[in-house]
Amino acid sequence: MTLEGFDLVAFGATTPLLLDYRPWHLSVAFVGLLGSLTPIGMLIGSLLVGQFTDRFGRRRTTLISIGVVSAGMFACAAAPVPALFGVGRFVVGLGVGAIYPAMGPLIFELAPAGRKNLFSGIVQCGTAVGGSFAALVANTLLTGHGFHLEYLVGGIAGLLLLPLAFAWLPESTEYHRAVSASAPVPDGRGRWLVLKPPYLGTTVMFCAMAGLSFLLIFGVNTWLPKLMQTADYPLQDSQTFLVLLNLGATVGGLAMALLADRAGSRGPITACFLLGAAAIIAMSARLPLPVLYAVVIIGGCGAVGVQGLINVYISRSYPVTMRAGAVGVALGVGRLGAIAGPTLGGWILAAGLQPRWNFVSFAVPAVLGAALTLAAGGRALQNQSRSAPSPRAKEPTAGPTQ
């Protein structure tokens, strides 16, 4: 997850440098298109990962995904032309898109009852840590070196992470049980069962929530430095805001995870969306710098931290035999929002709006996400109570879902 966070923020941190790189002469709209190639790869990786997970296990799938991300980073670092840079970004997306659908159900199954959100939040902190590291690298090392160095650091980080993951990442207990009992590995039908009654409405709801969350995360992380530049902040301060945004996602995300374990998922998810919207709009004001820093941290809690809560909400709303399929479908379809985020952000900035309206436009997905979460109500819990028992086990899903 740290590697995923590094990639997510690396592109946003290097966006101003890409626009200023004279040999390529890139427009704002074209950089937005480049930013969308990674989410396209994520969409494909998320939808296909179930087949690899069923065949090779969640641990092995995660290790392969880390290697793919690292290879894509090296391709970006060595790219002599924008087209090859775009290919590298797409390859990175394939790997990143496969990581969480393989790891998410594993985390959920290993976490003790009543601590599902907390354990997921702790793992999700890796995304914020990686994002903060990417922003720090951009802030301290890129001056005078160009954007290629950022991606070289990311590729090296992936290579260093592989042996650590190989040594310490456990396999799913469910997968071990199936193999040791000589039972056939699940054939992936869970991916299609989640698209049939009584789960169809729940799946559509989660796809929409994930789509709005990813649109917000990728849009803000890609364009926050440029947004702050339009508000007359220098580039170095603008990159500092990325560090604070991901700090807020770490600290605030854990606080919201603890709340979700006590009160259920729906309220904290709604609160995160609303906090994100309010903070993004507040960033457009000329606030004293310490106050602005606090606002950006709050924005990170809401805009970036919400996805970890949604991931657990998905996992706890389906039986164990459908859990990986549900996460893969919801996050895969939700990646459409990740594709749209950088592109829409590029269009907004290219439209030449007043700086305040740029920020308001970026806050709209957060408002829609809060409204959708409130309107969804207890659909997940209702569908869970109507569902048939699991074909292999009568295992209940965990915890409250409203």
Label each region the model flagged.
Residues 12, 198-253:
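Extracytoplasmic gate region of multi-pass secondary transporters
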Residues 12-44, 237:
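Extracellular/periplasmic helix-loop-helix junction of adjacent transmembrane segments
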Residues 44-80:
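Conserved MFS/SLC helix-loop-helix module at the cytosolic interface between two early adjacent transmembrane helices
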Residues 57, 78-84, 112, 264, ...:
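Helix-breaking motifs and short loop linkers at transmembrane-helix boundaries and internal kinks
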Residues 68, 72, 83-91, 290-298:
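Paired small-residue
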Residues 88-125:
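Cytoplasmic helix-loop-helix junction between adjacent transmembrane helices
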Residues 123-167:
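Helix-loop-helix hairpin linking two adjacent transmembrane segments in secondary transporters
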Residues 260-310:
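C-terminal transmembrane helical hairpin of 12-TM major facilitator-type secondary transporters
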